[in-house]
């Protein structure tokens, strides 16, 4: 039987792994700046992180925490492993940004932003 073996949660005020709060002291206000603080706390060493949208950053960090806790070998992926992502607002942050690019006064659709309006892009990142 398949089961969830580890999970993480990221909110504006809490980062937890398997229900246990992580000891991260935030110096920034709630919001995207905290994602960078979590990244630095984890010492992830993945430069592409800084080019990601906020949803992908959160997904990357959540995955990094879970996979590390399971001692997952990134060099030899196991096909029986899966990830499940959930949030309450999907890609709303990017949806708003894309809407700005197609507003009547500023009509210039951005494919670079549009790709991040697809919630599953976080899995690819």
Please state what every model-predicted region is.
Residues 1-125:
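Conserved "HGTGT" condensation-loop signature of ketosynthase/thiolase-family condensing enzymes
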């Amino acid at each position: 039987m398949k089961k969830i073996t580890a999970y993480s949660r990221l909110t504006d005020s809490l980062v937890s792994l398997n229900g246990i709060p992580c000891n991260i002291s935030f110096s920034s206000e709630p919001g995207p700046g905290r994602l960078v603080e979590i990244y630095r706390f984890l010492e992830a060493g993945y430069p592409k992180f800084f080019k990601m949208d906020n949803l992908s950053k959160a997904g990357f960090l959540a995955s990094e925490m879970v996979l590390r806790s399971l001692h997952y070998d990134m060099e030899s992926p196991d096909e029986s492993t899966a990830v499940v992502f959930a949030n309450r607002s999907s890609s709303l942050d990017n949806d708003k940004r894309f809407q700005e690019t197609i507003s009547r006064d500023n009509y210039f659709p951005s494919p670079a932003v549009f790709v991040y309006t697809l919630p599953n892009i976080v899995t690819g990142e």
